[in-house]
């Protein structure tokens, strides 16, 4: 990293103490809560070191380039881009999210700085943060004299014309580049600057944050309400949330008004109704596009008591996602989208499961809703998702992050590497592991201290101080030592999962508590506390079985708040000797800069469902198969069945070890298990479906999930203005009107021009619709959707395979094989183009 010295590099943080409390008035400043030894502290320390491995110069390059500083002779940044090239992957020329990781990095450094008690690490993190912030300031200053809508701006996407267009009330460029999600990227910069002020006390960050908030107001100031709502149909992160925060910090009502302007009213209105909200409204929607919107809605409701519709929307959204769409790891969605109740088999059959960003944001929303209600259900949800999803997404060896956590039996994780693969979940991953102390304790002022999480830690605040000693969940108890005398209430969570025997003692004296098993609540202890008082809380747990939401063929096992998983392969050769499990070198276990380098479904080696361990018995007898193995390590033995009739090689398991899911890394795992009687399994179509799906997947060279934002953007999607996307019978499609077109670029990695074909997925519901399929502007075939088709599935979908002539895959000079082909579908008949549900390039 190039050394640049700035006068403002050493700024103390006293003002941040009150700044955090401005935004989070019921939370303790992060630097006042310290993690003690345990899984969370270990993850935090690992992450601190991992953050410093990132090349800050390259993370800042997009901002420098867009500000024009790279080309300014005499500037310290002259020639910067050539020396420090921007990261690829999501900084591709055809789909750039440049700048988003830079924003996350500011947040991550600030959080890590506040959370650590290591003086040397704190110094390094602060120096790195100040270094980046002063670059951001220089970039922002470069726009100071601008009069075309860029004053106060700082950003990394190579599309400044979007912003000048919006300011001029011209949406042409935004419509062209909206799928690059420009406001999503800008939100990360806003949030990073906000957090650098809140958690690290940087006055530079505070000034830059105010300026970019002013820009956020300015750039859309000339848009009509209808045009504003149109652009909010594209992913825009939590723009509304950060603007509410600006209102809280600076007291300028313009920011609160702007937050409402940045609020997608379709999503507000779609989740109204106390207990009567639509349970289908979220079906098919891109999940993490939505969660930050509702965080912003809740922030608006916190600052504006009259915003009851925003409050209802946030509450109902959480209820729907937490109660109807959350799976065994505490996450939600498949391949980034919410499923319908009729399509929940995809939790198991789809290889790319819950996205880490979703859970990161659901935890934020849970905190906010808890602050407004002190409802213990939010804390229960937080605990479960934190242990089973967030903690499990860190590679304990390298500190790398995980994008999708597959729920498929025998899946494995794909980890990021520093300075490679700038995925969105790398950004939130950077932040996650410095926030474990954020919600352990909260308060309502000076009267009540809430103990929300059972995490070994200390709290030292002007009003409260205590130490929590525990090895939870490996110990079914926690001890709380009061370190500051005073008259106040301590409220301790009674979790939903706790069994009979929950008890609380103070200095050895048992307290009378009123709790209901299976219902989350708080036990309140009101007294005049003396320094040294000891509270003991007993937290008995039991093993239980939970069904997969709306797909009851599969079950998971939980102990207390912990999901129990099982390895089916060894982590390494030594683990093979210890466990007796076979060792497998996992394909592409570490992601790269390829477009889908984060995807287990694309980059990993998937196995068939029928080759996984099974539980073939009556459901009433499942728990009889499980016995305690090592209670101190939460380990159990489970008797399993191996499907010897599988078309794939099946390891002859008889027993496997259940243990906390987050511990299982660098190996294939089970979290959901097929559980039906032998006779039901024998009549199921699992093996046939496995065989058919595997045959297609093994032949797939490239794949476009049409109608899905990231897949389309990653394949240089180009379509006419009348094109639309949607979902039919739980599958996504894209079509266009008469005369319109849809085009994608597919990559041919085979190096061959022969024996390749195109597979297109359609539905007979579009019978009579006509399209011309072209390759690089050369017609391949005119297709008409029939009323009936061979191999139509039960929902009316079928696959159409079109062989590709070798000449279409050969360069025009005849001397090489094309590495890319443009597949265009044109509505050449008198009807709209038939909806296309995916495009595959297949090898023989």
In which residue ranges do the predicted regions lie?
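Bacterial Sec-dependent N-terminal signal peptides
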Residues: 1-21
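Beta-strand-rich binding/interaction modules
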Residues: 487-506, 756-758
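Beta-strand-rich ligand-recognition modules
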Residues: 510-532, 538-552, 724-753, 761-843
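Aromatic (Trp/Tyr) and acidic
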Residues: 20-119, 123, 127, 161-199, ...
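C-terminal beta-rich recognition modules with glycine/proline-rich loops and embedded aromatic residues
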Residues: 314, 380-388, 393, 399-482, ...
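Asp-box/WD-like beta-propeller blade repeats and closely related beta-sheet repeat scaffolds
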Residues: 159-180, 206, 212-230
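Solenoidal tandem-repeat scaffolds enriched in leucines and small polar residues
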Residues: 213, 218-220, 226, 230-268, ...
